[in-house]
From Swiss-Prot:
Cofactor descriptive note: Manganese or magnesium. Binds 1 divalent metal ion per monomer in the absence of substrate. May bind a second metal ion after substrate binding.
Origin species: Prochlorococcus marinus (strain MIT 9313)
Binding site for a divalent metal cation: D30, E31, D126
Residues annotated as domain RNase H type-2: 24-218
HAMAP family for this protein: RNase_HII_B
Chain segments annotated as transmembrane: none
Localization in the cell: Cytoplasm
GO biological process: DNA replication, removal of RNA primer; mismatch repair
Pfam families, per database record: RNase_HII
PANTHER family: RIBONUCLEASE H2 SUBUNIT A, RIBONUCLEASE HII
SUPFAM superfamilies reported for this sequence: Ribonuclease H-like (SSF53098)
A molecular-function term among this protein's GO annotations: manganese ion binding
Protein name: Ribonuclease HII
Gene from which the chain derives: rnhB
Amino acid sequence: MNPRIRAAAAVAPQLQADMDPSAESIAGVDEVGRGCWFGPVFAGAVVLTEVAAVELLAEGLTDSKALTVRRRARLVPLIEDAATAWALGQASAREIDALGIRSATELAMLRALQRLPTPLELVLVDGVLPLRLWMGPQRTVVRGDSKCAAIAAASVLAKQARDGLIKRLASRFYGYGLERHVGYGTAIHRRALLDLGPTELHRRSFLTKLFAVNGSLT
């Protein structure tokens, strides 16, 4: 056996500990971009067999936040090929402002899950809060993106898709540094907002405090 696969197989039971062994179709779901000032929040949903999980772990699958851009990009096609099913969902900045970030995040997760072609026996949700919009069986997994291969895979797909979208939008919204911070609240982003004002894709509900101190939100 390949040493990487042997090592991954040794830790796979721990990483999959939150899965129901009697269930055959389990999806991991995770969000990306919850704290950003700009653009949509994304969610990924992935169904993996145990064999696929072990193979992906051997390739270095882990929480997307712990991966370099290059390693994450390399994992994306591997996840897409290995997964029984995968899908993405998103909720727009306008929906975030209208619904609030938690409800909008849940909407993105629901959209991802509804796009899966596979009927689900269980959904594993990253974090401590349940997915209120999902009517089927579910289980929350604290720090699930570092404990469950399906959730980690979902986070990688969502992160790669969202970051790619924001970087493509950087040329349309020039001057905000989106290609560098992909919408997060950095000093460069803050300065650009104060100089240029928010765009149509900024989350105005996130900027209220910034502009309350520094001027009008127009």
